Amino acid sequence: MRLILRPEYRRMLLSLDPSEGRVVTRTMRRIERAREAIGKPLRGGLSMCRSIRTGHNSRLRIVYRPFDNAAELVAVGKREGKVVYIIALEILEN
């Protein structure tokens, strides 16, 4: 799967600390290697997106929108208070 990084996603990725950035990069490679969309399907305004945890005990999530042979990475961040999902919805609505 080819990865498409939105400009907002790039900024969010650069704002993470280096150790979180490495874990997110590994998860991005998992998405890239997958033949089908992986992660949890989302509902509501993000029903066209999926969310994947970056690690077993991680609170970081990547929200992405799968297409035929590509995945558009929309947002990355902590799940605390569903902030990453609210940001992803705002990004997609604009």
Located regions from the model:
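A short, surface-exposed loop/turn module that caps and links secondary-structure elements
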Residues: 29-56
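Residues that form or immediately flank small-molecule/cofactor binding pockets and catalytic motifs
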Residues: 8, 47, 78
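Enriched for short, Lys/Arg-rich terminal
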Residues: 2, 11, 36, 54-61, ...
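Arg/Lys-rich, positively charged N-terminal/basic patches that mediate binding to nucleic acids
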Residues: 1-28
